[in-house]
Amino acid sequence: SSDCTAEIAEYFASLDTRIRLLRNPQNMGVAKTRNRGFDIAKGEWIALLDSDDVWHSDKLEKQLAVAGRAGADIIYCSYALVNESGAHLSDYIVPETTSYDAMLRESVLSCSTVLLRQLILREHHFSAEHYHEDYALWLELMRFGYRAVACREILVDYRVVNGSRSSNKFKSAKYRWEIYRDVERLSLPRSAQAFLTYALHGMRKHRRF
């Protein structure tokens, strides 16, 4: 990271011995960096937070409560879309559950909203070969039959930043199609059907900006 993330993490690590700051010897890219963290982590659950996003203070507590009741492998939550200044744009309320077929049509999981069992991530990693490495992993987990359940409360502020990977709609669409065809090996008709639904959901989700 070229911003102050490391310094901020270092400060909090000095206050709490449970926090460990790991520095890459060189820029390894987002997928390999996350995978390194997965391999080192010792806890039962793993949560991710992208540097642009904000967790609400009770996010982990509420997701763990759902995990205890539901016995799920993946817990995800609803989120608020905010702009670069933190101003509210819209809310995205996730469905109670999702599946492989549902995730083909609309991805309700995102890095900053998921809580995953560590055992899963010992066997499944982000691929550095794909632009949408997170979406490719979510599909893989669903295909393997892991159970995902929602905490439907808004527990994350998801920041929409001009020029970010997620804000480039045309490039996102291109790589979504490649995942359908090259990674999941879907037929042309099934890919087209999933892509059309994905596009319609995207227009609805981002209609306010």
Task: Report each predicted region and the residues it spans.
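Conserved donor NDP-sugar-binding/catalytic core segment of glycosyltransferases
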Residues: 58-89
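The conserved acidic donor/metal-binding loop of glycosyltransferases
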Residues: 50-54, 78
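Short aromatic/hydrophobic "clamp" motif used to bind/position activated sugar donors
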Residues: 46
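A conserved acidic beta->alpha catalytic loop
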Residues: 1-8, 26, 50
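Short alpha-helix within the catalytic core of nucleotide-sugar-dependent glycosyltransferases
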Residues: 6-7, 35, 43, 56-68
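Non-catalytic, C-terminal membrane-associated alpha-helical segments of glycosyltransferases
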Residues: 148, 154-155, 163-209
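Glycine-rich, basic loop-to-helix element that forms the pyrophosphate-binding segment
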Residues: 24-41, 62
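Conserved nucleotide-sugar donor-binding catalytic segment
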Residues: 39, 97-171
